[in-house]
Amino acid sequence: MNRLPLLVAQTVLVLAALSAFGWVVKHRTKGDLDLGWGNVVVDQLAGFPDLFKKSVKEAQTLPQTYVPTPDGFDPINRLTEDVLALSAYSNEDEDRNIDLWNLRTGDVVHRWTLRRDVLDFKVHRRVHHPLLLEDKSVVSFITGREPLFRLDSASNMVWRQDSLLFHHAINLDAEGHIWACVQKFEKGGPWTAYRARYEMDGKTVHFLDNSIARIHPETGHIEYVKSCVDILKENGLEHLVLRSGDPMDPLHLNDVEPALFSGPFFEEGDVFLSFRNLQAVLQFRPSTGEVVRVIDGPLAAQHDVDVLSDSTLVIFNNATQENVGRYTHTAHKYPVSKEQALLKHWYSHVVEYDLASDTFTPLHEELVREHEIMTFSEGLQEPLPDGSYFVEEQNSGVLWVLGDDDVLYKDVLASHHKGHHHLPNWTRIISSFP
């Protein structure tokens, strides 16, 4: 059978349909054709190429506040008790929502919105580690930039503090004042610089200093600032800066955790300082300027230290060298031997530190190995009342609740961009909403 006439007929019909559709679009654009309910269909079909182009461009240029969601990602929710989580993310207007939501139900309990017309920031900037106050206001900051700010329960700006660069973490002390990881600005402008140096073999090594600051929650006024380099120098600990593999950023302060009560090993008002690149946590007493204890051992690029009891701390141990996530073996030119010593496969995990015995106990070893939990930077844990732990695997954007021998929760913050979820910004677990 000769199919040529059929093919010609089909081609003519397709061309006729395209011609008719083109004519309809032309006159819809000119505004002299009304198809009633058909207008919506025609307009959507005509706009599809623009929509497709926009989607491709969007996928190629998404801010780094979004993370690709793996194909086949399978959430888990076995929670039997409510877990309230506070975190910030980018909304469809590229403003920042700060949501308090229930991990068990997925319900949003309260939402604050930081609008870009109120506080100007670029689309890839992150609103970090929000802190809930008793009057339902929140304090947060643009990480690595100024300011620290407070929003009331209706998202109105209460105050802003622009005199320091805020980064990583903020926490409340027993008096309700805010402790923050900061860097000081140079005089004359809002920028930071190498504020410390040491000499070695005729060379001068300039490096970044960090500081800790205490902020009044009602006014945002700075009450106290202390250089971390000065803390080391005044306590005979200058040698610690030589431990780091990054000579320009040897400290990298990433948490300041106040002790809310006194115990046999610390006093109320002590602060525990986590330094990623020192591979150590320092117990510092601001009232006397004394470093009470240097906590090191099987810690590597750790983040987040919490006081669990009067004798125990918990620390999020990233268990990585600071640059392994950035470089691969191709950075080195040595050949690979056929006979290699094999060390363990490392995963990020929570570790308990006993202040009495100076010993470390890793938690959830089998679970983190089974689920390959790993974040080269950032990451945190929060102990929950039932003995389980909330864990933020920050680089992948996966949120976990780990029981003693089972995963109770695993999910991501779904975004309005298909195939992508939100990068978490140091989620805080809240015991109750005021």
Question: Where do the language-model regions lie?
Answer:
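Histidine-/acidic-rich catalytic cores in large beta-rich domains
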Residues: 6-434
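Positively charged n-region of N-terminal signal peptides that target proteins for export
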Residues: 1-5
